[in-house]
Amino acid sequence: MSSSPVSPPVPAQPYGRPPLRTVQVLDGAGSSAHVRSLTTGLAARGVRVTVCAPVRAEGEYDFTAAGAQFTPDAVSALRAACAAADVVHAHGVRAGMRAALALRGHRTPLVVSWHGDGPAARGALGRLAGLLERRVAKAAAVVLGASSDQVDQARLRGARDARLAPVAVPAAPAAPDEAAKARAELGAVERPLLVAVGSLVPHRGYSVLLDAAREWRDLDPSPLLVIAGEGPLRAGLSRRIEAEALPVRLLGRRRDAARLLAAADVAVLPSRWEPRALLAQEALRAGVALVATEVGGVPELVGDAAVLVPYGDPGALARAVSALLADPGRRADLAAAGRIQAATWPSEDDTVAQVLSVYDELMERAR
């Protein structure tokens, strides 16, 4: 199944009953693209959707235009929204905890998607994270995992009903001429271009990526690595890039990730953990060779259509990228395999239909 845009919202009264009322709860912007896609599809099927999220997420993703009522994520607003809902759907464990607290005293079913929540830290912080996961897993009527490892984790934490629910990414193809323009803008017309995309946080593995970049300095021509994303590690990464004269540019937050990936010779995903990596999906769809760490849900997602390396091994990462840069035929084979693999993923409509079937099932249980 290839990904396709969900249908635009149209008025409907499903099943001859009053419209189902849902609240989508976000704790940040990480799941916003998925929630906007889900909102569009649910609204098209006659579901009334309220999105409770940070104001900045509404400003960037415009849930209202997708057919939702937007409510800021203040505690009082969340409580009021949840009190009027038939189903509450939280995206992420922290959002799940906030939703569970807001629903205390109510019998409204809670659905929790765990996409984006990785392995817990060690020590006291890890114990606290484990406690949070157990509370949320037990509070949820259904837990949806974007990858099989997340489903397993939810079950270990006590989820009574945990299911695999892959998240489709909205297709955003870039025009061929845009790729050439992007290379020119980045200064990579006559040198290879490597692209990584994601927030500058520890689990993304960018320190390992910079270690690998030291080895690429000796290639002729030396590739340019660009990293699109923002986060707390920016200052430290910038200091390393300057001190070690690494062929790396930090681009900050970008809204044209698809355009950047279409321009790349190789996409790089060095993360410590990923459930259903957005970068991997966009790279394979765009027909760009991908080198990724063999972690989380990545192997399940990409199959044989990417080169996988161990996490935390800069030598293996550097060698894999160098080998692809030296072998255009192998890159072309991966590009073709990537498009074939991407065609097997659920579409946005498939994702909406699966989520709506869960909501309907919960409503039937309550009757």
Regions found by a protein language model. Give the residues of each.
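N-terminal strand-loop element at the rim of the active site
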Residues: 15-76, 150-153
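A short, active-site helix/loop in glycosyltransferases that binds the activated sugar's phosphate group
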Residues: 138-163
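Conserved acidic donor-binding segment of nucleotide-sugar-dependent glycosyltransferases
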Residues: 304-315, 323-329
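Short hydrophobic beta-strand element within catalytic cores of glycosyltransferases
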Residues: 289-292
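A conserved mid-protein helix/loop that constitutes part of the nucleotide-sugar donor-binding site
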Residues: 32-41, 192, 196-215, 232-238, ...
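Short His-centered aromatic/hydrophobic patch
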Residues: 90-97, 114
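Nucleotide-activated donor-binding/catalytic signature segment of Leloir-type glycosyltransferases, i.e.
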Residues: 238-254
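Aromatic "clamp/platform" in nucleotide-sugar-dependent glycosyltransferases that forms part
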Residues: 272-275
